[in-house]
């Protein structure tokens, strides 16, 4: 069995799945030898041995039919849905004699590779999304994943108590990056992954292998399609548009020389959504990107690949006015503000990569080697100069009062002036070589070692220019107030230039053994090493995991245990303190993970057996050398010091299946506890009504979201599958936050309100090519299929909070006013596919 994660490789049978099982007599239970097990369409076959066991390698990602025949017995066949490379499918055939009146019985079970959650995108494209980004889907399908405080305006996600910077993202084995200066979800444009180009994805919420890199939380591994024919699609809505084209062409007469192309372009504007915010003004967001993935099969053994992306995000905003009320029945505040000035942000990113893959044709012990090179570049400009004349007042909220809504007392009246001229230029270049070799042992290859290794060199150039300040004037006094000088608040003026080199490598072995009657055992162990020239830190991380699928259990269950050390070396944002000073001696953040879980595949149904999958995992992460941070909307502000330790523990569960035949749905629920403590500092907590604080051992991390629940449910009209309904529900307890500038001793003592949101979509199939014979004059007959959708965002019109705006009175008392996310909006969408 060859367990590969090479993007797009489909040469010979190296990108394979393993089909294995037992052929036996249904009446006696004895094994049947010399039974022919074959796939007719591919001319692949094998025979069962003396113990009735067989093993057959087949191409991944294809629909297959496995057949078995034996002289004197009735033949049997079993359809196989497309599976990912590295999957093992166990199919047992209980055959009957030709003279018997019994029916053949076939049992299937599958062992997924590496403890990763894998999904295809066909059913997920209908999920209502306000961002247009693929990552918005993750909270509905991935374990322990939430959307964070950015809510529906952001595609950032938190995994098991970590922040967004702790997540790895790969597309076709290339690591991808995102802009660093984003402050809010309003500025966020299009992320790298293009849903129109994705073939499948793998996601690990923790305990991942050594080959995946150096982050604390998760891995998202995306593979783009390798086309086999000419296809395309067009999509349009009130929030933007997208289009893609793909194709494959044989070069010359040699069938092994083939060129494939995949090109996609997207445009996004969330002006329609932003106009529902309480901060009124002229929003002009324009986001666009274009990307391509090309491959060329040089011959049987060599393949050349190239990937490219150019992304531009421009956000223009002229604020006009704002009126926000907040508080309780007996104490409510209203903020009224008028604005002058504007904000213009410009983010331009580009990425290009090439790969050369060698897979020699071998009958046994397959091998692959892959050479990769890539470059990423971003130029980010953030400019704003906005003056706000604000008025903060206590208002009457008594029911039935004649003065309801009127001011009772003036709390603050002043001017807030924010200014920024920030520039960040970032360039990352890397070279990488990785490989894999599978050693097969045993008469039926029931024992295998899959060795994988890789080395990588990375160069980073960073230029940062910050000119950022705020002036707060309350009752004609500039705060902070002095008798002689006008002192600005939060002044940052720095010039930082960094050049560094990173080197990393890994080695791991995956040992798989199958024994009749015992099941399949897979043990993976590896080490990861890295060095960074800037802080001169070298580390060595061992990681391991065990997957076991018992054969004697009545239930189809796979058990998993994983653990190891996971270090995250700092990138630029972690090193930059709130005052703009960069700490080049900052060491990596460190953690030790333990993850235990199970995957249960089962079927239910009276008339037809419908497959379901239940995944459950518990985990514990010990943290040290942590860099504390505060989250404001989507902006993460680090302290720039290794000054904290902590832990994260929790439970994740996911259930998915066809609750409605032909329409798959997902249900996710997670519980976690994330705590931290600053070294050398005694934290305190002040309970409501208490004047004095009491000592506590630790405090909540900013991502300490106790519970999250999300679901994506699909249904359709009875007897009419052309009209589909999909519901997206997200519920999460509030995340903690603290007072700006005073969030250390009494750290993260407050919480945002709970987040809850319902998005509803209706999709109607208005054309399908199968109708051509009876509708040969249809307006859309040139298309393969066409859908029209109506999406209702925030169906319940809930006011969810993204962040707070803070104001001070002349008495130096701080008041927080919530910044709410979007209200209810209706979106129209049209999608057309060509083939």
PLM features per residue range, with description:
Residues 370-374, 381-386, 588-658, 788:
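Membrane-embedded beta-barrel scaffold of Gram-negative outer-membrane proteins
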Residues 233, 239-269, 279-319, 344-368:
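Transmembrane beta-barrel wall of Gram-negative outer-membrane proteins
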Residues 320-322, 550-595, 618-641, 728-740, ...:
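Surface-exposed extracellular loop regions of Gram-negative outer-membrane beta-barrel proteins
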Residues 722, 730-740, 764-835:
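C-terminal beta-signal and adjacent terminal beta-strands/loops
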Residues 13-103:
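Periplasm-facing N-terminal accessory domains of Gram-negative outer-membrane beta-barrel systems
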Residues 512-519, 620-622, 642-739, 831:
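Gram-negative outer-membrane beta-barrel transporters
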